[in-house]
Amino acid sequence: MRLVDSHAHLDVAEFDADRAEAVRRAFAAGVVAVLCPADLTRPESLPAIAGLSAEFPAVMAAAGVHAHQAKDFVEAHLDGLRDLAGRGAIRAVGEIGLDYHYDFSPRDRQHEALRRQLALSGELGLPVILHSRLSGADIIAAVDGERFARGGILHCFTEDWATARAMLDRGFLVSFSGILTFPKAGGLREVAAKVPLDRLLVETDSPYLAPVPYRGSGRRNEPAFVVETARVLAGVRGLPLDELAETTTANFARLFPFEKTGSGC
């Protein structure tokens, strides 16, 4: 079985004590690649991911300014993205987007940061990793407003089927996190049942959103646990776990080609 964790925050302090070990545990569990978004507002974020990528080439980096940090977005962040892309140091721009649940940044600043980074992604020819929480209509409008055609990943999907369908129509893949395993996530599982197989991804969003059976145990989420989300998604789709794993891995590899070795190293 080969799986990809399409979104993990291995740069954060929760992994300072065992960052490399967490990657090794993931590989032992069947994970062959991990995509890690760096936070450009935290100077220590990208070096942490770059260190992992140097040791484990199947750990890939993205970078951007998240909706939560949009209040701190400045022009220099765009210059940084241009430099990173020019050096081949990132595979995508993200995680970027809108979050109307927490509203940690004013919405006008969220919109500005999203619009500017979408425009730059188009200029650079890079896909984006989008965050959308209670903001589906405005995410769609932003993508349309920038005429962004490169596609990418709608990560940790929790919106409705109408939003999923609209983003699928715009060339995006839809990624499901451990939320899919939660007992009260029946509506989300209904959406997951409708997404075309060739557009599905799985992720952990580590260290957050640990899937059942780890949810509530006090254990930090990590990439090895992506198998639990894949297991539930396989059940939703009526597929063997191995087939679902291979399908989602192939979907990821179309957007981010990589050497799919057995170990992920």
Predicted segments with their positions:
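Mid-domain alpha/beta scaffold segments of enzyme catalytic cores
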Residues: 1-265
